């Protein structure tokens, strides 16, 4: 399990996260919801090990405990951490004309037998990851020529390749996938396809997934658990049906909604009141 316990994060004198506790369970998808600036990306970066205890040069101070499979996250060295968790950050336009294949193969570098060397097995995994991400038609393309949605699918394939299961991965214990707005650049169809894939690999590979999602309806449709972040802490946490209520939405977003049942057994859909 990937766990934050009594986490506080502040930048100089501004508190971002306050006494926050949250666990990401293997085999389940947790969607993180909250307003812009609520601290969602900060929480994800802390889970990723990008923000560690003490005071960083940029003035960010982190206190509290983060553990991965019971081990303090700060004690896990970078090579081993890269085999235990993968991070998909918010989309950024690439500066160099790498090929799609090269970008996805980056996900295999933590597993290379020697520095910078990838094997036929790694290339096979990269191809399978592209297929799983619905990006196999983009093989050979220059990533600087891709649309935002195409690039998002390629980067998703990269993190799938990084966590692709093998005997060593199984022996290392549960692994984790951290996604920062993975659907932001995607059209409606690809949003649902990506999150369907996320939920499928979470179950098949026993991945713990934390995904920042801006659309509460999308999160409710595809997540096992929803965590709502407001005022620097988790204000609601549980199943989509339990968490997606007008009261919780108002507390999290300051916006009045009503819930409409879809009739297909899925959680209700949120619409403006």
Swiss-Prot record:
Which interval of the chain is the signal sequence? none
SMART domains given in the database record: AAA (SM00382)
What EC number(s) does this enzyme carry?
A: 7.6.2.-
Keywords assigned by UniProt, alphabetized: ATP-binding, Cell inner membrane, Cell membrane, Membrane, Nucleotide-binding, Translocase, Transport
Ranges for the ABC transporter domain? 2-256
Q: Where in the cell is it found?
A: Cell inner membrane
SUPFAM superfamilies per the UniProt record, alphabetical: P-loop containing nucleoside triphosphate hydrolases
What is a GO molecular function of this protein? Answer: ATP hydrolysis activity
Q: How does it assemble?
A: The complex is composed of two ATP-binding proteins (HmuV), two transmembrane proteins (HmuU) and a solute-binding protein (HmuT).
What is this protein's name? Hemin import ATP-binding protein HmuV
Gene name of this polypeptide: hmuV
């Amino acid at each position: 399990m990937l766990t934050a316990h009594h986490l506080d994060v502040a930048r100089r004198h501004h508190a971002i996260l306050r006494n926050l506790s949250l666990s990401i369970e293997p085999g389940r998808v947790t969607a993180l919801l909250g307003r812009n600036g609520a601290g969602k990306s900060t929480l994800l970066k802390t889970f990723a090990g990008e923000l560690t205890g003490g005071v960083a040069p940029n003035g960010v101070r982190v206190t509290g405990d983060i553990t991965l499979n019971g081990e303090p996250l700060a004690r896990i060295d970078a090579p081993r951490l890269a085999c235990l968790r993968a991070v998909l950050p918010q989309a950024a336009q690439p500066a160099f004309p790498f090929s799609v294949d090269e970008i996805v193969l980056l996900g295999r570098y933590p597993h290379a037998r020697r520095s910078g060397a990838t094997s036929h097995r790694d290339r096979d995994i990269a191809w399978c990851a592209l297929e799983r991400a619905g990006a196999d038609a983009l093989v050979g393309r220059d990533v600087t020529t891709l649309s935002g949605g195409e690039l998002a699918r390629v980067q998703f394939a990269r993190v799938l390749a990084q966590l692709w299961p093998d005997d060593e991965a199984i022996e290392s214990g549960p692994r984790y996938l951290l996604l920062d707005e993975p659907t932001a650049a995607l059209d409606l169809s690809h949003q649902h396809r990506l999150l369907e894939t996320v939920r499928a690999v979470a179950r098949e590979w026993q991945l713990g997934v934390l995904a920042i999602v801006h659309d509460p309806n999308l999160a409710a449709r595809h997540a096992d658990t929803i965590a709502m972040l407001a005022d620097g802490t988790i204000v609601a946490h549980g199943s989509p049906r339990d968490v997606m209520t007008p009261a919780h939405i108002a507390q999290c977003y300051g916006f009045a909604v009503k819930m409409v049942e879809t009739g297909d057994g899925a959680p209700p859909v949120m619409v403006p009141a």
